Regions:
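N-terminal Sec-dependent signal peptide, specifically the hydrophobic helical h-region
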Residues: 1-35, 52-63, 89-91, 98
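Conserved aromatic anchor
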Residues: 136-148, 229-248
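Short beta-strand segments within Ig-like beta-sandwich modules, predominantly Fibronectin type-III
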Residues: 64-76, 167-177, 262-272
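Solenoidal tandem-repeat scaffolds enriched in leucines and small polar residues
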Residues: 119-190, 198-202
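Beta-strand-rich modules
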Residues: 85-99, 181-207, 274-298
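Extracellular fibronectin type III
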Residues: 101-111, 201-217, 291-306
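Proline/serine/threonine-rich low-complexity linkers at boundaries of modular beta-sandwich domains
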Residues: 14-30, 108-121, 210-220
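Solvent-exposed loop segments of extracellular immunoglobulin-like
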Residues: 53-64, 138, 149-159, 245-260
Length: 306
């Protein structure tokens, strides 16, 4: 008898736990619902779906990922049971094989969302951002893990101090170009926040990057690097860099490496601060790169000359 009562009590508590998950249903965007479930497995949540007000008096049939329910799920307003990570795309139709009317994508996000598996976590985090100058345009990129190479971006949100920043997703889905309307001469008071929502099947993960523009400004490679009189090297400021150059100054790092070595080689000969060398250039590679003189942000990529 006690065993039976214990089993009944467990069943009641399990049902209560499942019903309590209703509060974790959030709308991410039109036609996309996010179900936040605990990290531990075993969750079961009833999710209400509506085909649409225009179909109130229609004989609506539902499908999940293109497959009809058995027995059929009918009605303009229905409830579906989502177990663990088994979300999907729920579509409504005029008949079992009839016209498509509407859909709701149910995605699952673990709560807390700290077990990320979709994007690679490299040096500096999952998202890497850079800007060529202070005009407000910046680009952020990411890399999917090998096992989640089919993952797709659902939504990108960028904002600064409650003001939305427009962004456009790259064609390959591995980056985004954003444009913030910022005066180049104005000191930044608030950070930019970028959140990328990306899904693999029904699993949703959110990745956030927060930064000041001055932290990610990386000058372009220095153009027109050339040698004069055999030992004097000259170059120009990048065309994309801010003007006047007296206000947006650059400082330079200069390096000589053995011929055949990369500018990133640790086998450097010397690091110097003038532009004249007294050695035979053909035996060495002259490398130079730049960074913002005042913020000391990221260095540009190396330019080189032999």
């Amino acid at each position: 008898m006690r065993t039976f009562l214990f089993m009944v009590l467990c069943a009641v508590l399990s049902g209560a736990s499942s019903d309590s998950q209703q509060t974790d249903i959030e709308t991410l965007m039109d036609n996309v619902v996010v179900l936040k479930v605990p990290v531990f497995m075993g969750s079961m949540v009833h999710v209400p779906l509506t085909c649409g007000g225009a179909f109130q008096n229609e004989a609506v049939f539902w499908k999940k990922n293109g497959q009809a329910f058995d027995p059929p799920l009918m009605g303009n307003q229905v409830q579906v049971l989502v177990e663990e990570m088994k979300g999907g795309n729920y579509t409504c139709h005029l008949s079992p094989s009839g016209e498509y009317l509407n859909h709701t994508m149910i995605l699952i996000q673990l709560n807390p969302d700290n077990r990320t598996v979709i994007l690679e976590n490299g040096e500096g985090g999952h998202i890497h951002c850079s800007a060529p100058n202070y005009k407000g345009s910046f680009h952020c990129r990411w890399r999917r893990t090998q096992r989640r190479s089919d993952a797709s971006v659902v939504l990108v949100k960028a904002e600064r101090y409650m003001e939305d920043i427009p962004c456009e997703l790259d064609a390959n889905g591995s980056g985004v170009e954003c444009q913030n309307t910022l005066c180049s001469y104005k000191e930044e008071q608030h950070r930019i926040s970028l959140t990328v929502y990306i899904r693999s099947h029904a699993r949703l993960e959110a990745y956030t990057k927060s930064f000041y523009l001055r932290e990610i400004v990386r000058p372009a490679k220095l153009p027109n690097l050339h040698i004069i009189d055999g030992n004097v090297f000259k170059w120009d400021y990048p065309e994309s860099w801010e003007k006047p150059c007296t206000f947006f100054g650059l400082q330079f790092e200069i390096k000589l490496v053995h011929s055949g070595h990369s500018c990133n080689s640790e086998n450097q000969i010397m690091v110097i601060t003038n532009y004249t060398v007294s050695i035979q250039p053909k035996k060495y590679i002259f490398c130079v790169r730049a960074q913002d003189k005042f913020t000391r942000g990221p260095w540009s990529h190396w330019s080189q000359c032999t």
